[in-house]
Curated annotation (Swiss-Prot):
Compartment list: Cytoplasm
Entry GO CC: cytoplasm
GO molecular function: 4 iron, 4 sulfur cluster binding; epoxyqueuosine reductase activity; metal ion binding
HAMAP family: QueG
Organism: Yersinia pestis
Protein name (record): Epoxyqueuosine reductase
Amino acid sequence: MAHPLDLNQLAQHIKQWGQSLGFQQVGICDTDLTAEEPRLQAWLDKQYHGEMAWMARHGMLRARPHELLPGTLRVISVRMNYLPAKAAFASTLNNPELGYVSRYALGRDYHKLLRQRLKKLGDQIQHYCLEQNNLDRHDLELHDLEQHDSERQGQPEQHTASEINFRPFVDSAPIMERSLAAKAGIGWVGKHSLILNRDAGSWFFLGELLIDLPLPVDKPQEEQCGRCVACMTTCPTGAIVAPYTVDARRCISYLTIELEGAIPEEFRPLMGNRIYGCDDCQLICPWNRFSQLTDEDDFSPRAVLHTPQLLDLFAWNEEKFLRVTEGSAIRRIGHLRWLRNISVALGNAPYLDSIVLALETRRGLHPMLDEHIEWAISQQLARRATQAVEVQLPQKKRLIRAIEKGLPRDA
């Protein structure tokens, strides 16, 4: 007689396999995100998604993973640490002549690596279930020798390996990965809208494996932010407009990565030297005192992007930009937006003749870039005329102190 698949045992195997594949944590949840739909719709209605039209276009599909892969019963959520050694947070942010790149983008693009590991996890599950199914089939054949077929009529149908279907996702489809991660017990959603884990902070990537097995689910973690609003008060542009709510239109990550056109002038002075993304809301978070370094070589910083001189980066032509950023998440913004972002950072730097000269040599490449170059030159000349001394914004002063005191390993 065939035995049903032991799903509890399989769930334990999945977590062990996941850790052997380099994931620091694996959790399992169902697909029900109906509670998230009103919040998602309200966020879209307020236009907080900015020019990311695909978010509005996909609408509530993001909260319905079972529609992405029909038949999906569970989501296997994983996290993988990405914080590199010697992250140089404070030393880079505190030097206006350097360019700050969000630490997730210093190494190779994470999408392919995580997707491949998730595919391997799915293959292991499939292989295990096939083996179990073959054992069951062998038992059933032995049993059939002793029992007439008619005696087995009416027995409940067992889940067989041939029915298993899975699909990996890594920030590559309309799916609410943070809500799923929270539901799967990976962590809780912080007020900056990122997932926090009490043992690992927030410096990790998320990935999902949708599967049609009714695996046992994990319990969510209790939210541990309490009254803390450090991320909200530290955000340079005030993008965290309410607890758990980010107005992407104000977020430096959106402005430097997702926005294709001109960066609104009101935000440019607030961007400082951040040229690709922003980590401030993570850097100030007390839970990141417990962050763990990555053990993935692919996430190690490329030397040319680690504490880079702005003028050196600004001198890259398109060929060099494409060559240096091959396999990097940075490449997706293209050379034009790369120069746009660096122009803003140069405009925020202390006056130097070499900065003005470098900006002037880039005139005429594109009208959008020209507009940022003219702004940056005007900022430089105004600073020279007043002999202005750089004055750090209160949020930045507080952030640098917090990093040096709370994250000395990564300062």
